[in-house]
Amino acid sequence: MSIKVLLVDGSHVMRSAIRQLLKNELGIEVIGTATSFAETIALTTALKPDVLLMDPHMPDEREYTPKLVKSQILLHTKCIVAISLWNDDDTKTLAQSFGAHVLLDKMNLYAELIPAIKQFCPSVSIPKTTDSFRNDSKRPAGPSTEERLDAP
């Protein structure tokens, strides 16, 4: 059984890059992509992803408060991982207000994304074949720059 990921980002280039990164990971399947909070709510409700991988800065962010988005998505996903190019205090607070378990820097996703899912999404398990592959891999063993966000 694979981990179902819904990828939410306003940039086509970033969505494509992350999709390619996850495509190479055993046991993880990108089941959809969203480019706005409106799409995120609809797709999370319909697809019920295990992991919601989202940028907290979206084109329609003025129309959707974090409280509204959080109330609609938390019922249908097990774990939220926020990603952003900005890792300042305001973005960390924003990610936390959406219910994110962690905020990752987009510049470090190659090394940090899979380890972060394993660390911060304990109810989601990556198959053992992936774990053994990771142990033999030359990639870094774990996240190096992410910070855990305490859920409200």
Predicted regions and their residues:
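Conserved phosphotransfer cores of two-component systems
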Residues: T45-L47, K70-K78, F98
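Conserved acidic segment of CheY-like receiver
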Residues: S2-V13, I18, L22, L52
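A generic structural motif
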Residues: L26-I31
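Conserved phosphotransfer microenvironments
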Residues: L53-S71
